[in-house]
């Protein structure tokens, strides 16, 4: 009986290790293509919101380019494609896809797997969010921001908007459907994302190919 109990405990431990290892999976992204694309003025002309998505996934090179456009590093000193107040770099970009939730790590140009669960439907209150290839979830780190309210809310809102507009312009250049959203059950989503108390969801943005 004791041997059986020990075997059960060992099996439970191994399963925990396996699940933990799966959650810590890292996806290395291809180097972003930082030249070419649609001219800026044309991308501004084409920029729009769309809410009808096909189920087609984004290829890794396109995903890499999207994330770099939104919040990639574009200078040797570690600065980003979008500004941030006091250079706090306080916004994290999470990517919710059918194969799990990932954290974009711009310095390493990689995705850190947070969960294997498909939480796309929980990233907003609109039905279409579950159909988009991915949903970007912008999360502010209040500890990094190091500001008191209401200044913190103002600046993290502005910082998030810069990232979202970068993503909009990339999607216009690439012919992707995109819409930024504020209608989110933030407490429920934060729990699914395993966020820390000092992390605050600001906006989400659905991205994918247009429905044909």
Which functions belong to the PLM regions below?
Residues 22-132:
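N-terminal amphipathic, basic helical "cap/leader" segment at the start of enzyme domains
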Residues 32, 139-141, 208-210:
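Generic beta-structure capping elements
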Residues 1-10:
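Bacterial N-terminal signal peptides that target proteins for export
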Residues 47, 66, 93, 134-189:
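Small-aliphatic-rich amphipathic alpha-helix that forms the alpha element of a beta-alpha
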Residues 190-194:
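Short secondary-structure transition/capping segments
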Residues 195-212:
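A glycine-rich helix N-cap at a beta->alpha junction
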Residues 9-18:
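Bacterial N-terminal signal peptides
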